[in-house]
Amino acid sequence: MRFQIEQTFAADPATLCAALVDPSYLAEAMGRLPDITAPILQSQVHDAKAGTVRQELLYAFNGKLPSVVTRFVSPDRLTWVEDTTVDLTTRTAEFRITPVHYRTFFTCRGTWSIHERPPGSARRLDGSLTVNSPVPFVGGQVEKAIVSGLRERLEKEPAAFAWWIAQKQK
């Protein structure tokens, strides 16, 4: 399933891009999003010469799941790693999301880009999610549920970002 999500932020593109690789933003602001724990920064490598940051974030789901999903996964084992390489110069990134416990359950990858959108900026995510279900016709339903949850959380990220910026300015 292909998906596209666009977010609007009240900050210039450089500030937004820098926040997305700032450990305090990841821990404090991302932890305010519904149904997931604050991500744990497993690794972060800055390549000054290339102008990139590669980071691995471990997430855990802590919300309610639709019954169609709980038939196949245990909510307490629903954890995943988001491996992202951010190009700070072009304000673009490539990401891959890999389940920790259900390694063959789904594959998700994509890109995002940040561009100016007065009075702030916008981030556009383009991705692809494939659920490998042993039951015919269920994979598509699970894909829709996962993308719907992702969209819901990402719609709330600009408010978490604004809160984080306000906390930094105190």
What does each model-identified segment do?
Residues 16-20, 125, 161:
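Hydrophobic pocket/interface hotspot
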Residues 12, 17, 76, 149-153:
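Short amphipathic alpha-helical segments
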Residues 40-97:
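Glycine-rich portal/gate segments that line the openings of hydrophobic small-molecule binding cavities
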Residues 9-11, 88-90, 118-120:
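A generic beta-sheet turn/junction motif
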Residues 81, 85-88, 139-170:
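A conserved amphipathic terminal alpha-helix motif
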Residues 53-55, 80, 85, 94-148:
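Beta-strand/loop substructures that line and gate deep hydrophobic ligand-binding cavities in soluble
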Residues 1-65:
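Hydrophobic ligand-binding cavity/cleft-lining segments
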